[in-house]
Amino acid sequence: WSSDVCSSDLNGNTETKYCEVGDQVRVVAAQAPEGKKFSHWTVNEKPICYNESYTFTVYKDIAVTSVYVEEAEEIQKEVSVLCDVSYANGRVKFLSKYSVPTDADYKVIKAGVVATDSTGYAAIQEVQQELTLDTTATTRLKKYGVNTDLYLANFTQYLKTSRTTTWYARGYVTYQDNSGEQHTVYSDMAQYTIR
C-alpha cells in the first residue's frame, strides 16, 4: 500500500511525498513571511498540531497544510479529533488521531473510538441520537479507549470480522479543563463498507 502526503506552505507551494502506509513522516513549517506567524497544521482542513514541526503516521492519502496568521492575531487553539475506518485481512481498523493544546492547562484523561455497524447506526438515526459514548439507542455499540496523558497521539483498535456491513465510527478525547470540568470532543463520522 502506498499513500500520498501533500503539504503546502503560505506561498501556495505544495510538496507531495509518496509513502508507504505505516511510515512516519515529519513536516516542518516554512519560515513565515514578514508580518505573519505560524499558527498550526491542518490535516484534511482540521487543525491537528500547533507546533512548527509535526510528525505523524501515514494511514491513507492526506493533505497536511501549514497555516499562518497575521503577527498581531491571537492564535485560538482548540481540541481536535480525526477518525478513519479501513478494512484489510479480515479486520476493521479504527484509527483516531487527537490533539489537545499543551498550554491550555488541560489534563488529558482518555482517548479512543466509539463504533457501530449499519444495524446499530440505523437504530441511532431512528431516534435522532448521535454516535457517542452515551448513545442508548443500540446495544451494538463498540466502545474502545485507553486512559492516557498524551496531548498528541493516535489510538488504533482492530475488530476481526468479515460480515458484509458498514462500520461507523467517531474518535474521541476526554480532557479536564482548569476548573476541573470534564469534556469529550468527538471527530466527524467516519465509515467503511465491507463488501
Regions found by a protein language model. Name each.
Residues 70-195:
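Short, surface-exposed linear motifs at loops/turns and structural transition points
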Residues 1-7:
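Short, small-residue-biased leader/transition segments that mark boundaries at the very start
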Residues 23-52, 164-166:
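Surface-exposed interfaces of beta-sheet-rich extracellular modules
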Residues 8-37, 58-60:
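Extracellular modular ligand-binding repeats in secreted and cell-surface proteins
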Residues 20, 49, 57-59, 87, ...:
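Surface-exposed coil/turn segments at beta-strand junctions on protein surfaces, enriched
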Residues 15, 52-56, 62, 148-157:
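Short strand-edge motifs at loop-to-beta-strand transitions and within beta-strands
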